[in-house]
Amino acid sequence: MQYAILCYNNEAEVFSWSKEQDAKVMADLAVVQRKLAAQGKLGPVARLMPTSAATTIRKDRDPPLVLDGPFAETKEQLLGFYILDCVNLDEAIEAALELGRANPGGSYEVRPLSVFRASALPE
């Protein structure tokens, strides 16, 4: 089963890290990522650009409203994600805990994925 690990943290804090601090966190995460890859669990990994680069589309009106910036103002922002192929939720949680030990602060949300393949859609 595939799981998404959604990585939330305080964007202002993370983007205030020095290059050395950021490189250390990324190197520590890379150790865990290599382990997950060797186990055949690691799928796509992405670090999102700052929320200032986001565009939000409000669909509660016609026509939809396109706005600069994130959908909501929150204490923590979605800063990245992992896609993992795990046997069960417990295995995905263990991977998230291991990633969390390498990354200070924030929180991880583990969520099962339902994959839709375009080739399987009716014409």
Q: Where does each model-flagged region fall?
A:
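Conserved, structured core segments of small domains
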Residues: 1-123
